[in-house]
Amino acid sequence: QAGLADRTGATAVLDAAHACVAGGKRLRPAFCYWGYVAAAGRPIDPGPLLRAAASLDLLHASLLVHDDLLDGSDTRRGAPSAHRRFEALLPGPRAARFGEAAAILLGDVLFSWSAEMFENAGLSPEAVRRAASVLATMRSEVLLGQYLDVAAAFGATDRSTPRAQADTAEKVLEFKSARYSVRRPAELGATLGEAPPGLLAALGTYGSLLGRAFQLRDDILGVFGDPEATGKPAGDDIREGKRTVLVLTALENGDARQHDTLDSLLGTPGLTEEDLTTAREIIEATGARNSCEELIARSTTDALTALEGADMDAEGRSALITLAGLATDRDR
């Protein structure tokens, strides 16, 4: 895209795009690639599959740009978030507004480039057609899941009962993360590899269960993670008022004082480190962290069980088992 950026004079967008795709875990492309191998074995020419899988990282970058803007996050992977990077280009009182506007456009451009990269990856027209519905569903699910996450943080979802809040958190967990991060990428690769229905079903179960465990690990890191490892300030989920499964478990398990204290801290501007320590102590004391750790372990075990008995390539199976560990046993 360098030539287009030069012709339009929008080289700052290309520079920011490079920064957005630097680092990261590359898990979604990995699940896509090994989903294909599970169905069809290693491709003779891996280039088209690798390009198609890599396009998922451009999609992910586009969503992270918008996610950081929605959350007001200053950093991503230890560097300034996209809107802060753009903001630094313009001195004066309108810098923040420019940064926000430019970040919206950068996210849109990355989304477009992701689609272009997939379509021009060199896959056969038949393969592109087979995969189109999986990719379209994946995009829609993550965007609607993101809306639910934002709505819950702002109090625009049903909070009338603990069950209603838990239902919203479960939907966010499934659609914003589990399907988007693991299930759909694995199904996309398997669909490209012409997987039979039985294998697609096994990968779907594996993907949803493992994706839940992946997000629960993120939720724990969002409260207890080391900023040096995560690249984001500790306690951001508390600052942003995220009512994750972890937080809702603490609210449900806590006594009246613990519940009211934690509830009052969620989404409150200007939280101090002492406030965040209080929130962490409540989450620990109520057993919420241990409960989520147990749920991660159980979901991961169930995900691996879903692969048993499924007819798939041995190397693909082994890689999917390895990826399960990488997705859940991590510090970033």
Language model regions located:
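Short hairpin/turn module used for nucleic-acid contact or packing/dimerization
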Residues: 277-332
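C-terminal helix-coil-helix/basic helical segment that borders enzyme active sites and/or dimer interfaces
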Residues: 38-40, 46, 189-198, 221-229, ...
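All-alpha helical catalytic cores of prenyl diphosphate-utilizing isoprenoid enzymes
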Residues: 3-6, 20-28, 104-112, 119-224
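Conserved N-terminal diphosphate/IPP-binding helix and adjacent helical/loop segment
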Residues: 1-56, 61, 65-66, 70-92, ...
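Residue-level signal for inorganic ion chemistry
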Residues: 31, 114, 145, 247, ...
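Short alpha-helical scaffolding segments that buttress acidic/His motifs in well-ordered protein cores
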Residues: 16-17, 35, 53-56, 135-142, ...
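Alpha-helical scaffolds flanking conserved acidic
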Residues: 42-59, 100, 128-135, 199-210, ...
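Divalent-cation-assisted or electrostatically stabilized phosphate/pyrophosphate-binding catalytic cores
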Residues: 76-107, 157-178, 201, 205, ...
